[in-house]
């Protein structure tokens, strides 16, 4: 129903996009038992805590620069196959350090995967470096400094992810100042696990152009108006929200309400195979579960390009491909 539509994704965690088949092959390669996390070709978890545990276990089987090149290439090839023209991948150099690969080799592998995929299909991709709240402000500042000093043209944004309930956004404001001063685009996870107040905190402390999720803003009518007035773009991931119980079903999900209130919204998949979804399915849901027309979906894709962390020449080229 929506395969013919051009697609753009602004919110996807790279390790969270690992296809189960590739993960199974990687586990065999390293002799790692992931039978508790991967059964019948699907990732297994039952609540947010076990999702994070499953995510970490899956990430363990990606260890080398080539592993990350292959993971990135595989995901971008999948996107290109459904008419996707642009993708932003959320990546963590800190994760590269923790697994002993190192931040530079981690990023280098990912960039090689982007190069391979683009050579085949023309898909464009950029990287958003993320700090993780649960490792504390100093770790997040380190991630921002890495992104700011990398001098890598594919690193164009900075994000804050991880456990939303760990501290207030103001605790991490210094990291965003560093990223902003380096000319990086700013986005932040808020309004997912925590309520509308976390979105307000993000606006007050960080002044981001985009917010990852942000859907709990619907709980505060004044905040919704503020988002609309500011033109802040929400990276909405409906399948993820339902899978994690942020909302009980698509009928209660606020994507359409937010759009009709004038908030700029886009569609993404977050950690697709973990939530039994894909970018293709998210676009299908936009049509079938939310009743958006092709023109309305195209408008959200256009919003995503307008909000993408790219140079103006690339933005014009992407808009011309719609």
From Swiss-Prot:
Cofactor: Zn(2+)
Binding-site residues, Zn(2+): 11, 13, 189, 270
Cofactor binding: number and manner: Binds 1 zinc ion per subunit.
Binding residue positions for substrate: 271
Residues at the catalytic site: 192 (proton donor)
The organism's place on the tree of life at top rank: Bacteria
Alphabetical list of Pfam families matching this protein: A_deaminase
EC id: 3.5.4.2
Keyword terms of this UniProt record: Hydrolase, Metal-binding, Nucleotide metabolism, Zinc
Site (Important for catalytic activity): 213
NCBIfam families linked: aden_deam (TIGR01430), PRK09358.1-3 (NF006848)
Function recorded in the entry: Catalyzes the hydrolytic deamination of adenine to hypoxanthine. Plays an important role in the purine salvage pathway and in nitrogen catabolism.
Family that this chain belongs to: Belongs to the metallo-dependent hydrolases superfamily. Adenosine and AMP deaminases family. Adenine deaminase type 2 subfamily.
Name of the protein: Adenine deaminase
Lineage, highest ranks first: Bacteria, Pseudomonadati, Pseudomonadota, Alphaproteobacteria, Hyphomicrobiales
């Amino acid at each position: 129903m929506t395969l013919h539509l051009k697609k753009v994704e602004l919110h996807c965690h790279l390790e969270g996009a690992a296809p189960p088949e590739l993960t199974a092959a990687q586990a065999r390669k390293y002799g790692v038992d992931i039978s508790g996390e991967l059964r019948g070709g699907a990732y297994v978890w039952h609540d947010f805590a076990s999702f994070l545990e499953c995510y970490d276990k899956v990430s363990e089987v990606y260890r080398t620069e080539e592993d990350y090149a292959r993971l990135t290439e595989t995901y971008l090839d999948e996107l290109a196959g459904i008419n996707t023209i642009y993708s932003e991948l959320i990546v963590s150099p800190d994760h590269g350090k923790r697994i002993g690969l190192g931040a530079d080799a981690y990023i280098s592998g990912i960039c090689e995967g982007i190069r391979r995929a683009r050579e085949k299909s023309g898909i464009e991709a950029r990287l958003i470096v993320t700090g993780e709240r649960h490792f504390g402000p100093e770790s997040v500042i380190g991630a921002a400094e890495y992104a700011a000093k990398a001098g890598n043209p594919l690193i164009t944004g900075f994000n804050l992810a991880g456990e939303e309930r760990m501290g207030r956004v103001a605790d991490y404001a210094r990291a965003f100042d560093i990223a902003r001063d380096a000319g990086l685009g700013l986005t932040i996870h808020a309004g997912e696990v925590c309520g509308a107040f976390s979105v307000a905190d993000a606006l007050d402390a960080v002044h981001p152009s985009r917010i990852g999720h942000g859907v709990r803003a619907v709980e505060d009518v004044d905040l919704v108006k503020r988002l609309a007035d500011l033109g802040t773009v929400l990276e909405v991931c409906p399948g993820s929200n339902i899978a994690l119980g942020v909302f009980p079903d698509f009928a209660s999900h606020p994507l359409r309400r937010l759009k009709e209130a004038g908030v700029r919204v886009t569609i993404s998949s977050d950690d697709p195979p973990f939530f039994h979804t894909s970018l293709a399915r998210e676009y299908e849901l936009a049509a079938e579960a939310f009743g958006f027309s092709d023109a309305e979906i195209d408008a959200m894709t256009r919003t995503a390009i307008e909000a993408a962390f790219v140079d103006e020449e690339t933005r014009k080229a992407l808009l011309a491909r719609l």
